[in-house]
Curated annotation (Swiss-Prot):
Ranges of the Cytoplasmic topological domain: 1-16
Induction (UniProt): By dehydration stress.
Gene that produces this protein: ERD3
Biological source species: Arabidopsis thaliana (Mouse-ear cress)
Glycosylation sites: 594
Cell compartments where the protein resides: Endoplasmic reticulum membrane
Enzyme class, UniProt record, top EC level: transferase
Membrane topology: Single-pass type II membrane protein
GO molecular function: methyltransferase activity
Protein's UniProt name: Probable methyltransferase PMT21
Positions of transmembrane segments: 17-37
Gene3D superfamilies: Vaccinia Virus protein VP39 (3.40.50.150)
Signal peptide: none
């Protein structure tokens, strides 16, 4: 009985536990069921909200930005160059003139105001007349006129500066100087030489003369307090950019220019291990030419006028010759004040040098890309052209204008780049340029001379406009795919740049700015406000901007442009894309309201 009683008691306890367990299971099931209904409802509601938000974006799919307003800068900022500001020079060292290099202000020190034109500013004289004269009030600098009056760089006549084509090394005029140069370098006559760089350009008379001979020159000079060389060049309608060979590479890829020129530019070529000449070597195309006039060339007849001794100049010339030979340059021609050296067209010379462990300068190692040129330090070593490139040398490069539409060999270095991509890009920009001209008839007229394509790929717009009376500075982002070598291989010019910073030019230097997806590609890094302020700084009064952007950014850009005193209209692209819009803008000509009060 005891056993049975115990078993009964256990059974009775078990019978009480079972209903509780079943009840617990039922309650859990009910809760899951109800929870599922609730969550399902919630999911449906969230989904509906997402759809509603999506549909609202479809209606107004655009970036919303805070309203901005810009005051006028004071009149002493009329020639403000943020990254080469003479006001800041004393903060930087004088060694190798590093203070003249780019030193951009931090965000908290950036100017958020509109740069005014000089008092009495007028719309620039139109090309080609501008090559010979400009308004004095637009570039009111008398230093060259007073200090170089005997050299005929320029002279002031009434309200204008006149450019007679003189210079330190061409007293008989720049045309006679270039005629002699062409006699020494026949490749200047037949389209072999298309791109050139002029270091220490003066008022860019050399580059201006070459334009008439089918050679496109980048005139280079540093920012200064009194000469304004680059500003004069751009006011004349001649390509130019602020820059100096100091401690950093110039913002150009390797093997780019067909010719480099220095006319008494006073660069100490043999000092500091020859790094300045090594930089010229880097950017010069294999088989390209380096032209030097002035000390120490023709020292035998000129040394007395150089405030030196014949022994010192002979020594300088011998050092220069030795340095050039060590870089695989050969003397090509020499007459009177002009000497021409040619860079080795192949790598045989460099291979011989590498067998000598004591050779100087050494070959650069693989740790530094030859095309790396944005805040990249100069190094005392030779950049040897890549042996895989067989058609980059000057002789193998198609002559101008054939090279403009020939697929460059270096497009294979661009991710996804090939001949088909190049041809498609070329065709695409012909269509786009035709559409632009319908929307902005000023393109092709004398109203537009200096043009910047702010984020080009292969220079397609510049190629499409090549027959118009204008030139294009092609800008490739230092953060984008390296397509700038392709631009140069086509016979066009350009530079690397980061649009989170100011460009290396004076205010009021471009007639037309072209933007293609810049804000889309750089929106994560660069503040739209600062980019557009920079566009306003470098755009001439009454100048134009064509902004090709996603619909998402278009309205915000137009809103900021209004505060810049631009007038903009929205247009369809040539394909009437719903995802992309065109803004055709014009900058207003205005004068500083602070000028009179500041002068009183």
């Amino acid at each position: 009985m005891k056993y049975k009683d115990e078993k009964y008691e256990k059974a009775e306890k078990g019978s009480r536990i079972l209903p509780k367990t079943v009840l617990l299971i039922l309650l859990c099931g009910l809760s899951f069921y109800l929870g599922g209904l609730y969550c399902g409802k919630n999911i449906i509601e969230v989904s509906d909200v997402a759809k509603a938000e999506s549909s609202s974006l479809d209606v107004d799919d655009s970036l919303q930005v805070k309203s901005v307003s810009f005051s006028e800068c004071s009149s002493d900022y009329q020639d403000y160059t943020p990254c080469t500001d003479p006001r800041k020079w004393k903060k930087y060292g004088t060694h190798r003139l590093t203070f003249m290099e780019r030193h951009c202000p931090p965000v908290f020190d950036r100017k958020q105001c509109l740069v005014p034109p000089p008092d009495g500013y007028k719309p620039p004289i139109r090309w080609p007349k501008s090559k010979d004269e400009c308004w004095y009030r637009n570039v009111p600098y008398d230093w060259i006129n007073k200090q170089k009056s005997n050299q005929n760089w320029l002279r002031k006549e009434g309200e204008k500066f006149i450019f007679p084509g003189g210079g330190t090394m061409f007293p008989h005029g720049v045309s006679a100087y270039v005629d002699l140069m062409q006699d020494l370098i026949p490749e200047m006559k037949d389209g072999t030489i298309r791109t050139a760089i002029d270091t220490g350009c003066g008022v860019a008379s050399w580059g201006g003369d070459l334009l008439d001979r089918g050679i496109l020159t980048v005139s280079l000079a540093p920012r200064d307090n009194h000469e304004a060389q680059v500003q004069f060049a751009l006011e004349r309608g001649i390509p130019a950019i602020l820059g100096i060979i100091s401690t950093q590479r110039l913002p150009f890829p390797s093997n780019s220019f067909d010719m480099a020129h220095c006319s008494r530019c006073l660069i100490p070529w043999t000092e500091f291990g020859g790094v300045y000449l090594l930089e010229v070597h880097r950017i010069l195309r294999p088989g390209g030419f380096w032209v030097l006039s002035g000390p120490p060339v023709n020292y035998e007849n000129r040394w007395k006028g150089w405030d030196t001794t014949i022994e010192e100049q002979r020594s300088n010339y011998e050092k220069l010759q030795e340095l050039l030979s060590s870089m695989c340059f050969k003397m090509y021609a020499k007459k009177d004040d002009i000497a021409v050296w040619q860079k080795s067209p192949d790598n045989l010379c460099y291979n011989k040098l590498s067998n000598d462990p004591d050779a100087y300068p050494p070959k650069c190692d693989d740790s530094l890309e030859p095309d790396s040129a944005w805040y990249t330090p100069l190094r005392p070593c030779v950049v040897v052209p890549s042996p895989k490139l067989k058609k980059t040398d000057l002789e193998s490069t198609p002559k101008w204008p054939e090279r403009l539409h020939t697929t460059p060999e270096r497009i294979s270095d661009v991710p996804g780049g090939n001949g088909n991509v190049f041809k498609h890009d070329d065709s695409k920009w012909k269509t786009r340029a035709k559409h632009y001209k319908k929307l902005l008839p000023a393109i092709g007229s004398d109203k537009i001379r200096n043009v910047m394509d702010m984020n080009t790929a292969y220079g397609g717009l510049a190629a499409a406009l090549v027959n118009d009376p204008l030139w294009v500075m092609n800008v490739v982002s230092s953060y984008a795919a390296n397509t700038l070598p392709v631009v140069f291989d086509r016979g066009l010019i350009g530079t690397y740049h980061d649009w989170c910073e100011a460009f290396s030019t004076y205010p009021r230097t471009y007639d037309l700015l072209h933007v293609d997806g810049l804000f889309t590609s750089e929106s994560q890094r660069c503040d739209m406000k600062y980019v557009m302020l920079e566009m306003d700084r470098i755009l001439r009064p009454s100048g134009y901007a064509i902004i090709r952007e996603s619909s998402y950014f278009a309205d915000s850009i137009a809103s900021v442009a209004k505060e810049l005193r631009w007038s903009c209209r929205k247009e369809q692209t040539e394909s009437a894309s719903a995802n992309e819009k065109l803004l055709i803008c014009q900058k207003k000509l205005w004068y500083s309201s602070n000028a009179s009060s500041e002068t009183n």
